[in-house]
């Protein structure tokens, strides 16, 4: 097993602390003894070749694997002093604290307004005016309010792909999570929409801990404060993004970033 190089200052406050995490798809050992601390209110990027475990690791943070009995995680994922893997916390409450946006836009088959209000109604009892304010706040945070304010009661499917993805981000932050997970959120978008999402990520980190999976090296370099390089289910190197891209400790990391991988 490869030894991990971690270069994170001790002064950095961790939001999620991962210790000896292993993950299995049936008999397949997908994540191997992962140890890392995700910094609070920063953007952390997971990079690596397809199948290296990036998305699997991301999805352990809100237990997305829980729907599949053959999938299991072992070890610790600590958040606010609680091990999420052994906690009896209601899974809906966990996913309210740890929101997620997927690779392809997934608006609900309802109006733009109800896309935002749906999750809020599960956890809060707001008056109509309070809900109106929350919808406007979330859409504004996602840089979508000006484009959507005159068609709030039209279907979310009527939005462009980039707008739909921003709608999904607005839906995720409407319930005011502490962590936002983004699984390749720009892979299906054009460059202009991608640029808007990246600008949004930069703004969101002031209030949320953001973790993004991306195959786009330039995106990781532009958007993230910290970067983790993974390969074959192992964490190879984790550190400040500038250092990872300019002077990585591990040759494997350098080879991947410079395109000499494989």
From Swiss-Prot:
ABC transporter domain mapped to chain residues: 16-257
Membrane topology: Peripheral membrane protein
Enzyme Commission no: 7.3.2.1
Subcellular location: Cell inner membrane
Binding of ATP, residues: 48-55
GO biological process: phosphate ion transmembrane transport
Catalyses which reaction(s): phosphate(out) + ATP + H2O = ADP + 2 phosphate(in) + H(+)
Enzyme class: translocase
A GO cellular component entry from the record: plasma membrane
Transmembrane spans: none
Main localization (coarse): membrane
Keywords noted in UniProt: ATP-binding, Cell inner membrane, Cell membrane, Membrane, Nucleotide-binding, Phosphate transport, Translocase, Transport
InterPro entries per UniProt: AAA+_ATPase, ABC_transporter-like_ATP-bd, ABC_transporter-like_CS, P-loop_NTPase, PstB-like
Keyword presence, Nucleotide-binding: yes
Superkingdom of the organism of origin: Bacteria
GO molecular function, one term: ATPase-coupled phosphate ion transmembrane transporter activity
Pfam families reported for this sequence: ABC_tran (PF00005)
Function: Part of the ABC transporter complex PstSACB involved in phosphate import. Responsible for energy coupling to the transport system.
Quaternary state and interactors: The complex is composed of two ATP-binding proteins (PstB), two transmembrane proteins (PstC and PstA) and a solute-binding protein (PstS).
Protein family per UniProt: Belongs to the ABC transporter superfamily. Phosphate importer (TC 3.A.1.7) family.
Name by which UniProt lists this protein: Phosphate import ATP-binding protein PstB
